[in-house]
From Swiss-Prot:
Pfam family of the protein (one): Ank_2
UniProt-listed PROSITE patterns: ANK_REP_REGION, ANK_REPEAT
InterPro entries found in the cross-reference section: Ankyrin_rpt (IPR002110), Ankyrin_rpt-contain_sf (IPR036770)
Keywords: ANK repeat, Repeat
Stated name of the protein: Putative ankyrin repeat protein R760
ANK repeats: 67-98, 100-128, 129-158, 160-188, 189-218, 220-248, 250-278, 280-306, 307-336, 338-366, 384-413, 415-442, 443-472, 474-500
Domain of life, per lineage: Viruses
Length: 501
């Protein structure tokens, strides 16, 4: 870093939040006196800075020619609105002349008339950059500075009358009134002044501009569009009273009021003819993504499709439980959307959604078992009297059945019923599992008949190799009728073996 003397004084430009900066633990930037005018844009106060080089925690940095430190001492405070501060800097060696234009613009922006007069004494042309200083004063609403500039020959009509545009944009009603006296065109730049007065909610100013010829319909009724988008209810109401077209731009005003959740404005626009149907379902999806329950309820009440799969997906993916409840309140049939909701809830681990579905008497356990989702079943508090186990076995989900059995010692299962259906469905693994439990089926002949009917030779072999003297006459007849030669041969062989034994 550059060398500096032990007692060298540095400078920092600070703003109105200076006390917050002083108490901060952030890195502090400062400068030498020869660069101080380059930092005017950062505030309206000047602090003299010394460096606590004897502090063992002190660190000094240089970044792209900028000086900063983690610890500094704040000394004398100067007001940059006071010409004496600039005199002091010049006396200390600061070269002000190369910076006069920037100082002029900075002072005009802040309304520091004394500083403007100060740099004027140095011979600076107040009209530099096509009277830009005057436009900056209008932007800030510094009327004393505006009047001073006009008295000293600056033209308020310079740059296509843009002074009135800035004055209106930033809500400076009195400044606009001053400028109009000098015959500025309030419709300049496509009615910029009115458009931005409406954008920022300045009703009194907007009314004044309209009374003086500003066009409320400029830019395809931009005024009511932007006022609606920005949430200015009273401005929207005022513009409607002045004849603004609420349907302009394919109901732009209503569309964006809804997108910003300004329902009170949306209702106002609809009252005067705006059509909500244009983007109804798209806005519902967007509102769900924002988790805006008020807007979703409003759209649902106005006919939006709450059964839209994108809506359901969005709500469950983001775990918006209150939003789901809102849709139910407005007519969503949970049972009809059960598969979509539970599939996403399972994938995203949304237990609160699953618990809510259970509270609404949706049989989530049955759904999980039917689809063979062991991971999902494990997410559910299991209260099963045996039906879930039976269903899992009949559908061939042995892992789920074993889990349910492990979670409930007080279950009742009709294993004979399960055995018959397992044989019918050809569930070899389930049949073997049931037999391994040393259960004794009560309807073996019936099970054999179902296995034969559906062509499950492997099931027949398991049963008939274990049990003797099973009546299979009907099954032999079925095998002939169904043209199952392998099954027929096996059954006849079983019958012959019985007779031999």
């Amino acid at each position: 870093m550059d060398c500096f003397s032990q007692n060298e004084v540095f400078f920092m430009v600070t703003n109105t939040d200076e006390d917050i900066i002083i108490e901060s633990s952030q890195k502090f930037f400062f400068t030498r006196i020869d660069n101080v005018f380059d930092f005017l844009k950062y505030g309206i106060y000047l602090r003299e800075i010394t460096l606590p080089t004897n502090n063992t925690n002190f660190k000094l940095y240089t970044e792209n020619g900028k000086l900063s430190a983690n610890i500094i001492n704040f000394d004398v405070k100067h007001k940059l609105s006071d010409p004496e501060t600039f005199d002091y800097l010049v006396e200390k060696g600061a070269n002000i002349k190369p910076h006069l234009v920037n100082i002029l613009f900075w002072a005009s922006n802040h309304g520091f008339l004394n500083i403007i007069k100060y740099v004027h004494k140095y011979g600076i042309d107040l009209r530099t950059n096509n009277d830009y200083a005057l436009r900056l004063a209008c932007k800030g609403g510094h009327n004393n500075v505006v009047k001073f500039f006009i008295r000293n020959g600056l033209d308020p009509k310079a740059s296509n009358d843009f002074a009135i545009c800035w004055a209106a944009e930033f809500g400076h009603y009195e400044t606009v009134k001053i400028l109009i006296k000098y015959n500025l065109d309030i419709t300049t730049c496509s009615n910029y002044a009115l458009r931005y007065a409406c954008k920022n909610g300045y009703i009194t100013l907007a009314n004044y501009l309209i009374e003086n010829g500003a066009d409320i319909s400029a830019g395809d009724n931009y005024c009511i569009k932007i006022a609606s988008e920005k949430g200015h209810y009273y401005m929207v109401n005022y513009l409607i009273s002045k004849g603004a077209d609420v349907t302009a731009g394919n109901n732009y005003a209503l569309n964006f009021a809804i997108k910003k959740d300004y329902i009170f404005i949306a209702k106002l626009l609809m009252k005067y003819g705006a059509d909500i149907k244009e983007y109804l379902n798209d806005n519902l999806i967007d509102a769900c993504r924002r988790n805006s329950i008020v807007t979703v309820r409003f759209l649902a009440e106005n006919g939006a499709n709450i059964n839209n799969s994108v809506v359901i997906t969005t709500i469950v993916q983001h775990n918006y439980l209150d939003m789901l409840k809102c849709l139910v309140d407005t007519g969503l049939n949970l049972n009809s959307k059960k598969h979509d909701i539970l599939s996403i809830a399972r994938d995203k681990g949304r237990t609160t959604i699953i618990e809510y579905m259970m509270s609404q008497n949706i049989d989530v356990l049955r759904w999980g078992i039917t689809n063979g989702y062991l991971d999902f079943v494990k997410m559910i508090p299991v209260i099963d009297n045996g039906f879930g186990i039976e269903l899992a076995l009949i559908l061939g989900h042995l892992d789920i059945a074993k889990y349910l059995i492990s979670q409930n010692s007080n279950y009742q299962v009709d294993y004979d019923y399960v055995f018959r259906w397992s044989c019918r469905n050809g569930l070899t693994v389930i049949v073997k599992f049931l037999l391994s439990m040393k259960m004794e089926p009560q309807s073996i002949s019936y099970a054999v008949e179902w296995a034969t009917e559906n062509g499950h030779l492997d099931i027949l072999k398991i049963i008939l190799n274990k049990y003797m003297n099973v009546k299979i006459g009907k099954s032999i007849q079925t095998a002939r009728e169904k043209n199952y030669p392998e099954i027929l041969d096996f059954l006849i062989g079983y019958l012959v073996k019985q007779e031999v034994d």
